């Protein structure tokens, strides 16, 4: 659901000619991983066809411009210093970056109290700590060291094969939190990380495997500052730039319903046609790949896997103001807390526009209660929470956008998919293994930076490389 008006889509539907119905490789899905796979194959003169269910490109990489000229990324938006594949892509397309606004005091709201502090929650806490009780703070930090040590013992390439993996995968993250934190703040802090920071979901701690959370931290650590920078013009401009290299090789608005394969090739059936190729790459989240029927059927472990990997629960809120008023108060525009709806918010303003933009999120169990309310009540709830962080000016935005990812039938949630208990060790071996002529891509299967754009790029590159080796 989107509440907006007067905006320009950064990745609108392409005006494309009818592509050839036969090619070297068919790519299902035009998210970043699918587009990268198609581009890399095309660059070495293999013919490709990208088939997308939606009427637009990009999947979770999707943006718009406000009437003020400020861009907003309705999907992912940040990049970090160790996300080398994403940084290489930005450099290739001459997309400029700027530091995520962070100057000033951050705000922690906990149990009705407000704390301003000059530090960062990036892995091990850095800088000045919030002035909560030392017992509560020490509880969270001691537990964090235990969590980090446990995560470092994992093999990020093969989490299903790590030492004691069965034991870790049999527990929820909530089990670990209960055992390792002893104060209300410690309990909330780790629950918040699971919901707001995500470690892939976001999910409630009771829903996600401890093994999966640990793997997410090892693969995509907040300690590497993945939200260090934003992009001038937004990440949503990237799909169109890649698509420009693919010419008439993209079909939009054609959901794939069936893929057949034999020893000669594949046939992909959409709601309106059939297309032949030598190989296929399915570049969607696992649950969407599971909606497609296959002939011959997928192996049992693959079929079982796609039934068990849900998307995280997240609605992104983008609220713009005539100026970043919080800076006048010495605030950074970054807040976290156990408020009614908004546990995390961040300044996403482009310094070249003068407009103030706050990105925030309603996640986990909060989402179900919030989305059931009326539009006006939802808006008031979000703005009231932002006022607790930044002051009464937050109640009067210029624009207010709800990006309801769980309602998107061809996405189904955000930020990414997660593994409930038992899934990694019972079915994880089927996550990325090709099945005959069908290969997989998507940020969920990345061994490094899973859940981020960088992970999506890595899997698109890997899938294309594998296909090139077979053609």
Swiss-Prot record:
What Gene3D superfamilies does the record tag this protein with? 3.90.660.10, FAD/NAD(P)-binding domain (3.50.50.60), Guanine Nucleotide Dissociation Inhibitor, domain 1 (1.10.405.10)
Which EC number(s) does the record attach to this protein? 1.4.5.-
Q: Name one GO molecular function term.
A: oxidoreductase activity
List required co-factors: FAD; Mg(2+)
**A biological process from GO:** arginine catabolic process
Regulation of catalytic or functional activity: Inhibited by Ca(2+) and other cations such as Ni(2+), Co(2+) and Zn(2+). The inhibition by o-phenanthroline and salicylhydroxamic acid suggests the presence of a metal cofactor besides FAD in the enzyme. The L-arginine-stimulated O(2) consumption involving slr0782 is inhibited by inhibitors of the respiratory electron transport chain, such as KCN and 2,5-dibromo-3-methyl-6-isopropyl-p-benzoquinone, which indicates a participation of the cytochrome b6/f complex and of a cytochrome oxidase.
Per UniProt, the enzyme's principal EC class comes to oxidoreductase
Residues bound to FAD: 33, 52, 60, 256, 453
Q: Report the locations given in the UniProt record.
A: Cellular thylakoid membrane
Q: Which domain of life is it from?
A: Bacteria
Q: Gene Ontology terms, cellular component aspect?
A: plasma membrane-derived thylakoid membrane
Cofactor, how bound (note): Binds 1 FAD per subunit.
Any one Pfam family here would be Amino_oxidase
The chemistry this enzyme catalyses reads: a plastoquinone + an L-alpha-amino acid + H2O = a plastoquinol + a 2-oxocarboxylate + NH4(+); a plastoquinone + L-arginine + H2O = a plastoquinol + 5-guanidino-2-oxopentanoate + NH4(+)
Print the keywords alphabetically.
Answer: FAD, Flavoprotein, Magnesium, Membrane, Metal-binding, Oxidoreductase, Thylakoid
Q: Where does Mg(2+) bind?
A: 31, 34, 283
UniProt keyword annotation of Flavoprotein present:
yes
Q: Does the keyword Plastid apply?
A: no
Q: Could you tell me what induces this protein? A: Up-regulated when cells are grown with L-arginine as compared to the growth of cells with nitrate (at mRNA and protein level). The increase is substantially higher in the PsbO-free mutant than in wild-type.
Pathway terms, separated by semicolons: Amino-acid degradation; L-arginine degradation
Family as reported in the entry's similarity comment: Belongs to the flavin monoamine oxidase family.
Q: What does this protein do?
A: L-amino acid dehydrogenase with broad substrate specificity. Catalyzes the oxidative deamination of various L-amino acids, L-Arg and L-Cys being the best substrates in vitro. Likely functions mainly as an L-arginine dehydrogenase in vivo. Probably feeds electrons from L-arginine oxidation and also from the oxidation of other L-amino acids into the respiratory electron transport chain associated to the thylakoid membrane, and does not directly interact with molecular oxygen but donates electrons to the plastoquinone pool. Cannot use D-amino acids as substrates.
Protein name according to UniProt: L-amino acid dehydrogenase
Species name: Synechocystis sp. (strain ATCC 27184 / PCC 6803 / Kazusa)
């Amino acid at each position: 659901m989107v509440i907006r008006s007067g905006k320009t889509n950064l990745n609108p539907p392409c005006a494309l000619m009818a592509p050839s119905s036969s090619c070297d490789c068919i790519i299902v899905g035009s998210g970043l991983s699918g587009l990268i796979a198609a581009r890399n194959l095309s660059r070495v003169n293999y013919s490709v066809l990208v088939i997308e269910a939606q009427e637009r490109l990009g999947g979770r990489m999707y943006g718009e411009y406000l009437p003020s000229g400020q861009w907003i990324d309705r999907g992912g938006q940040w990049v970090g210093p160790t996300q080398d594949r994403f940084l290489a892509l930005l450099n290739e397309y001459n997309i400029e970056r700027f530091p995520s606004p962070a100057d000033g005091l951050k705000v922690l709201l906990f149990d009705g109290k407000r704390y301003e502090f000059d530090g960062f929650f990036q892995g091990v806490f850095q800088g000045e700590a919030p002035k909560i009780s030392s017992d509560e703070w020490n509880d969270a930090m001691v537990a964090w060291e235990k969590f980090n040590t446990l995560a470092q013992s994992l093999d990020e390439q093969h989490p299903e094969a790590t030492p004691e993996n069965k034991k870790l995968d049999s527990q929820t993250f909530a089990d670990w939190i209960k055992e390792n934190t002893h104060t209300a703040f410690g309990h909330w802090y780790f629950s918040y990380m699971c919901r707001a920071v995500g470690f892939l979901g976001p999910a409630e701690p009771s829903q996600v495997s401890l093994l999966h959370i640990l793997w997410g931290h090892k693969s995509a650590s907040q300690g590497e500052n993945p939200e260090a920078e934003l992009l001038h013009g937004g990440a949503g401009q990237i799909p169109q730039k890649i698509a420009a290299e693919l010419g008439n090789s993209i079909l939009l608005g054609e959901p794939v319903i069936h893929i057949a394969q034999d020893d000669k090739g594949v046939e992909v059936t959409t709601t309106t046609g059939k297309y032949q190729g030598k190989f296929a790459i399915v570049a969607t989240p696992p649950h969407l790949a599971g909606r497609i029927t296959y002939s011959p059927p997928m192996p049992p472990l693959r079929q079982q896997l796609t039934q068990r990997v849900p998307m995280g629960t997240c609605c992104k809120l983008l609220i713009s103001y005539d100026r970043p008023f919080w800076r006048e108060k010495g605030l950074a525009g970054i807040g976290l807390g156990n408020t009614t709806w908004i546990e995390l918010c961040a300044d996403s303003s482009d310094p070249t526009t003068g407009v103030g933009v706050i990105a925030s999120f309603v996640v986990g169990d909060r989402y179900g209660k919030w989305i059931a309310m009326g539009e006006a009540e939802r808006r008031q709830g979000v703005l009231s929470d932002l006022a607790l962080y930044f002051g009464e000016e937050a109640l009067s935005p210029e624009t207010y956008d709800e990006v309801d990812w769980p309602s998107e039938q061809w996405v189904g949630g955000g930020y990414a998919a997660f593994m409930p208990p038992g899934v990694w060790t019972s079915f994880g071996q089927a996550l990325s293994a090709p099945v005959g002529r069908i290969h997989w891509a998507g940020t969920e299967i990345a061994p490094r930076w899973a859940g981020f754009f960088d992970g999506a790029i890595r899997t698109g590159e890997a899938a294309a490389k594998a296909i090139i080796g077979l053609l």
